[in-house]
Amino acid sequence: MEEEKRLELRLAPPCHQFTSNNNINGSKQKSSTKETSFLSNNRVEVAPVVGWPPVRSSRRNLTAQLKEEMKKKESDEEKELYVKINMEGVPIGRKVNLSAYNNYQQLSHAVDQLFSKKDSWDLNRQYTLVYEDTEGDKVLVGDVPWEMFVSTVKRLHVLKTSHAFSLSPRKHGKE
């Protein structure tokens, strides 16, 4: 009989010593006043819980802080604008953070250092910087204001000057 009481399934937390006596009819009798006083003396006031499984307020505060930190990281990452850059004749492309530069001169100097060779493309003007915008058009770097360039650039290309000028639209017809 004692073993059956221990194995009885109840809908109460494990800390409660809640026992009931069964009648012959199977109906439950009220527990004694000793048991209820035992329960009320041992009950500890806890903060209200939310959801299932219960989540305490300290956990909720922790998750709220983590969410704020993640949003801050995402906003910092959005400030960094990485763009792929490929040089004609070089099989491996690189990435450049455009937010690290303030104008075209700084960008061209960085690209010059990135693809440095014996003959620098900046000094000899054998190479020209071209960018691909959001519409897929290839435009010479420096044709538009810097802010517009940063907002529309999708990819940078370093092309030979002869190839870069063949990209410009040709006029068909008499003028």
From Swiss-Prot:
Domain (PB1) ranges: 80-161
Membrane-crossing residue ranges in chain numbering: none
Keyword Isomerase attached: no
GO annotation terms (biological process): auxin-activated signaling pathway; lateral root morphogenesis; response to auxin
Record key words, sorted: Auxin signaling pathway, Nucleus, Repressor, Transcription, Transcription regulation
InterPro entries xref list: AUX/IAA_dom, AUX_IAA, PB1-like
UniProt induction comment: Not induced by auxin.
Assembly information from the UniProt record: Homodimers and heterodimers. Interacts with TPL.
UniProt remark on domains: The N-terminal half of the protein contains two conserved domains I and II. Domain I includes a slightly degenerated ERF-associated amphiphilic repression (EAR) motif which seems to be involved in the activity of transcriptional repression. Domain II is required for the correct degradation of the protein through the SCF-mediated ubiquitin-proteasome pathway. Interactions between Aux/IAA proteins and auxin response factors (ARFs) occur through their C-terminal dimerization domains III and IV.
Name this polypeptide is given: Auxin-responsive protein IAA28
